[in-house]
Structures are given as structure tokens and as C-alpha cells.
């Protein structure tokens, strides 16, 4: 809307007509720069690695939701689960996602279970495009991941699959080279 207003003002001031294609190009560019890139997926699907590579490629700040949760709680994710339980962790996670979802132009790597809380969807989607990373179950590491260590991965994936699909705007395979995944996401943003 502001871009259209600027177009009209410029046309009135300069007496030059600006084509709709130019307006659309500017809107896409502004939207591309301001919208957050949100990464979701199973624990170990490569969200952190993809976020770091995307941040470098696009010159954007990378935010790790789990790091912010750990800082807020003053303990590691496994410690939060062991001492306070999953419910406490999920509350902290939703608080962090609410704060980060309001920001602009960041790359946010989420925890694998953020999709289990329906209230997280509007927090992530309000200013972001949600990319779901998929990876072959055999390639998913479980070390340091509390739920992945106590639950069968195939069962966990089956339970979360419909939730990931519901949240995702775009699904990207992360079974190949990191550069290919990054390029696929960059192309989807255009």
C-alpha cells in the first residue's frame, strides 16, 4: 500500500507515469527484505545449518529459538525438559516465538516441536514465510534432543507430519547438499 502511495506521489510530482510492473517489482523487493524466513522441521533436519548458510548468503541475522529459550531459562534444552518438563519448555518457546515473529528480515530456526502448539502458527506466519525442511529419517541425529531420544522417530514423524504440513508455506528437501537447499529457498523467496 505504501509503495502504491509513493508511486502516485512520484507521478504527481514528476509528471511521469510509472508502470505497474515497476510497482510490483518494488513491492516484491520490499516484501523479500522485510519478511522473516522461518525454518521448521523434525529435530535434526538441518534447520540450524541451513539458517546459518542462508544468513551468510542473504546477509540476514540468524536467530536460533532454542538458544534464546536456553538463555531465558538459564539452562540447556535437555535440562529444561528434565527439571521442568515439556509443558514449561513449550511455554518458553511460545514466548520466544511471539517476540521473534514480530521482527522483520530475520531468519528464525525453530525447535522441531514448535508445531505442536497451534498458537505458534500465527506468531510465525504474521511476518514470515515458513519453510519446512525434510530429511530422510535415517539421517536424523538424536543426540541432545530430549524428545527424539525418548520417542521412536518414525512415530514422532508420523504424529508431527500433518502439523508440519499445516504450518508450512513451502516444503524443501534437505537430503542433498546444503548449497542446493539454500538455493531452493532463495528461489522460492522470489
Regions found by a protein language model. Give the residues of each.
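Short glycine-rich anion-binding loops that position phosphate/pyrophosphate groups of nucleotides
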Residues: 112-115, 136-138, 177
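A glycine- and Lys/Arg-enriched "phosphate-lid" helix/loop adjacent to the NTP-binding pocket
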Residues: 126-163, 167-170
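ATP-dependent small-molecule kinase phosphotransfer cores
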Residues: 64-122, 163
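P-loop (Walker A) phosphate-binding loop of NTP-binding proteins
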Residues: 42
